[in-house]
Every structure is written in C-alpha cells, then in structure tokens.
C-alpha cells in the first residue's frame, strides 16, 4: 500500500476507535451513576430484602422496594401485615395494609398480565434523606396462622466500598 493511502486510513481508524471509546465510556458511566450508591439490607431470618435504588428519570431521588426472598412454596399463604420505615428514630412510613405476597413474587396473573416482583414504598425520596442516616425497616407478616416480625438495617453500597451487614 502506498503511503499516499496509508495515512488517511490510519487517521480514520483512529477516529473510529476514539468514537467507540467515548461512546462505551459514556454508557458505562451512566450505568454506574444509576446503579450506585444504593442502600440494601436483608432480614436475619433471610425472608426479606429491601433496596433503595436511584430513579432513572431523577438520579438524585430514590425509591424503596421490598422483596420476599423466603420459601416460595408458602408464598400463597404469606401476607405482609405492616411495614415501618425509620430514618434514625424518625418514622418515614407506617403502613398497616395487608398485602398478599403472591401478587408481588413475579410471574403472571391468570389473565396473562405480569406480577410485580417487589412491594414499592417511599417513591421519590431525596438522596440526602438516606445519606449518613441509619435506615431500618420493620416488617410484620404472617404465613397461615403464624405471625412473625423481621427487622432489616439498610447499608450503603457503593461501587468501590460495599459495606456488609
């Protein structure tokens, strides 16, 4: 190949590589900014998990989700009786609505519509409401005629420093 055609080809390849690097870097940074930080915790009985994650449309606002991670065989008899969310000692949410967890365990309803995978709570909570505070969640629930209570402490999870419970 003559040198007359070699330099424009190298320049074009360099521009293509630079464009690809910028494009993929942008998408990686966007993903990391949406993913971290978040707050999460699991109950000691390993039946519940709670997570506060960033909202995609408002990255400084968080929403909570409560997941049933316990025995899926008994999910039809499992009901969330009470959900209390506290920041330090201040109650942010106190809900006493009975919620059947089989409606929030994923899958589909009999009509084919999709079931939620979690119970949502505290939509649009600002980041400063969570940062530097002790967030605890108390869940009262029943399986059949057996009533139980579980407590979760949420810990901040970042990209470089994942705090364990």
UniProtKB/Swiss-Prot annotation:
What the entry lists under InterPro entries is as follows: DUF4944
Bilayer-crossing residues are 7-29
Regarding the membrane, this protein is recorded as: Single-pass membrane protein
UniProt KW keywords: Membrane, Transmembrane, Transmembrane helix
* Record flagged with keyword Transmembrane: yes
Q: Where in the cell is it found?
A: Membrane
Entry's Gene Ontology cellular component terms: membrane
A Pfam family:
DUF4944
* Name this protein carries in UniProt: Uncharacterized protein YdhH
């Amino acid at each position: 190949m003559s040198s007359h055609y070699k330099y424009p080809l190298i320049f074009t390849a360099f521009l293509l590589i630079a464009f690809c690097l910028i494009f993929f870097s942008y998408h990686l940074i966007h993903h990391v900014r949406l993913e971290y930080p978040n707050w999460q915790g699991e109950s000691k009985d390993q039946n519940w998990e709670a997570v506060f994650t960033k909202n995609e449309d408002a990255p400084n606002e968080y929403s909570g989700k409560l997941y049933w991670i316990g025995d899926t065989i008994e999910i039809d008899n499992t009901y969330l009786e009470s959900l209390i969310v506290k920041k330090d000692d201040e109650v942010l949410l106190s809900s006493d609505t009975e919620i059947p967890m089989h409606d929030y365990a994923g899958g589909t309803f009999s009509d084919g519509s999709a079931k939620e995978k979690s119970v949502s709570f505290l939509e649009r909570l600002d980041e400063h409401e969570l940062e530097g505070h002790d967030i605890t969640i108390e869940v009262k629930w029943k399986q059949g005629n057996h009533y139980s209570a579980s407590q979760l402490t949420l810990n901040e999870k970042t990209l470089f420093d994942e705090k364990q419970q």
